[in-house]
UniProtKB/Swiss-Prot annotation:
The keyword Cell cycle does not apply. The keyword Transmembrane does not apply. It catalyses: [[Fe-S] cluster scaffold protein carrying a second [4Fe-4S](2+) cluster] + N(6)-octanoyl-L-lysyl-[protein] + 2 oxidized [2Fe-2S]-[ferredoxin] + 2 S-adenosyl-L-methionine + 4 H(+) = [[Fe-S] cluster scaffold protein] + N(6)-[(R)-dihydrolipoyl]-L-lysyl-[protein] + 4 Fe(3+) + 2 hydrogen sulfide + 2 5'-deoxyadenosine + 2 L-methionine + 2 reduced [2Fe-2S]-[ferredoxin]. This is Lipoyl synthase. GO terms for molecular function: 4 iron, 4 sulfur cluster binding; lipoate synthase activity; metal ion binding. Pfam families: Radical_SAM.
Length: 320
């Protein structure tokens, strides 16, 4: 009789180890991958000094960036631009979404010093706009919302002119408690990604619920009507354009005014495959339709991600 696999606390499980814990449908490591089209090629910067400087700053303060942990294709561009998205509450997620490259496992307890370290790092880097995200922490009673609030409070103590965008998980089953934690220290922009269409949620976001996510965005907006809410979607996972447009309309119906829409890229052979590469002209059409729907800001393009040029989008600039 075989013994059940037991995860060790604080250990990162990725790729084959991550998908072997609980088998994920539609993943075949031996599958033939779609060839990337010409518009999906990234030109790396010639000078990596700025990139290394940001990485060193993160390491010095013991912080994580989602740029590295999720293998974002824009890391070189954003780091060279002097921007990064900080990932709080550790680098181990309690969920195992098969599109995501962040490690799965049993995370360590939150670091009580992290909010101060984060504030000091932002001060050292002289950042005027920051994005803070986190892994899912279904192991915590408030799902990590209190830690977000502490980070916002500490950042504002010594960086009063820095704008703060938070990209939050769905706070599963604790929406009211989470929003109560944030009420005294709200962000400047509240971001929560729907990721894709409800028909594919069971395959793409196991443990999540489309209606929960809409409820989170709706209830935050009801509490803070003057704070912009934002959400992001990936395309190329088997959805139809009509389904994406329906999700965009759901977002508008729930008060969301900022949208990001980009191409899904498969991090490894142990992740969901790309069903198709969406051409740039279709992203242009999505942006046009988003504007007609009433989105104030819509960043749509193959390499667009939730926090890609978030400062530019928040100020009303065109991102594509």
């Amino acid at each position: 009789m075989s013994t059940a696999f037991k995860m060790e606390r604080g250990v990162k499980y990725r790729d084959a180890a991550k998908t072997s814990i609980i088998q994920v449908k539609n993943i075949d490591p031996d599958q033939e991958l779609l060839q990337k089209p010409s518009w999906m090629k990234i030109k790396l910067p010639a000078n990596s000094a700025k990139i290394q400087s940001i990485k060193n700053g993160m390491r010095r303060h013991g912080l994580n960036s989602v740029c590295e942990e999720a293998s974002c294709p824009n890391l070189h561009e954003c780091f060279n631009h002097g921007t990064a998205t900080f990932m709080i509450l550790g680098a181990i997620c309690t969920r195992r979404c098969p599109f995501c490259d962040v490690a799965h496992g049993k995370p360590l307890p939150p670091d009580p010093e992290e909010p101060k370290k984060l504030a000091e790092t932002i001060q050292d880097m002289k950042l005027k706009y920051v994005v803070i995200t986190s892994v899912d922490r279904d192991d915590l009673p408030d799902r990590g919302a209190g830690h977000f609030a502490e980070c916002i409070k500490e950042i504002r103590k010594i960086n009063p002119n820095t704008q703060i965008e938070i990209l939050v998980p769905d706070f599963r089953g604790r929406i009211e408690q989470a929003l109560d934690k944030l009420k005294d220290n709200p962000p400047d922009v509240f971001n929560h990604n729907l990721e894709n269409v409800p028909r594919l949620y069971r395959d793409i976001r196991p443990g999540a619920d489309y209606q929960w996510s809409l409820k989170l965005l709706r209830e935050f907006k009801a509490l803070f009507p003057h704070i912009p809410t934002k959400s992001g979607l990936m395309v190329g996972l088997g959805e139809t354009n009509e389904e994406i447009l329906n999700v965009m309309q759901d977002l508008r119906n729930n008060g969301v005014t900022m949208l990001t829409l980009g191409q899904y890229l498969q991090p490894s052979r142990f992740h969901l495959p790309v069903a198709r590469y969406v051409p740039p002209e279709e992203f242009d059409e999505f942006r046009t339709k988003a504007e007609v729907m009433g989105f104030e800001h819509a960043a749509c393009g193959p390499f667009v991600r939730s926090s890609y040029h978030a400062d530019l989008q928040a100020s009303g600039g065109l991102v594509k």
